[in-house]
Amino acid sequence: SYSAARSDFFRYLLMYKEGGVYLDLKSSCSVHFDSILHEEDEFIICGWENETGQKYEGYGKNQHLKYLKYGEYQQWNIIAQRESPYLKAVIEEVSFRIQHYSPIKYHVGRKGVLNTTGPVPYSIAVERLIHTNQFSYRYERFAETFGLIYKNADTSVVNKNHYSLQTQ
């Protein structure tokens, strides 16, 4: 099964090949994309409003990403030019984790998805490439401040078989 892991990987491959804007099914945009996107944007990274008292307090905080001040980079939204080196790095990191998968190392169920194809390898790969200073990117601390909305759907329907409910 692990449809969420497959979806993660497919999303990275498609966005690498085609570029553009990806939003999760439950997400939306409150403004025209023209007001978000700038011609010079190659890759946009967004963080969570996850500090004490904020809307998504605690979201994206993961023991494997403690070195990132605000936790994981969001991958419910991906904005990239085609053949983005950032997405190439993500694909390589996820491929490595799939090829070397171990339930002991990466876990199973929800944790397995987060650690193998989800925000953990996504954030690790993106952060690693940021530190090379070779490629440009734009960082938006909060996605919602520039129009991206995390939950804009009835999540009881969308999440009926959500990967977070998987135990094996």
Say what each PLM segment does.
Residues 8-20:
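Small-residue hinge/turn detector
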Residues 1-8, 23-168:
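Glycosyltransferase-associated regions of secretory-pathway enzymes
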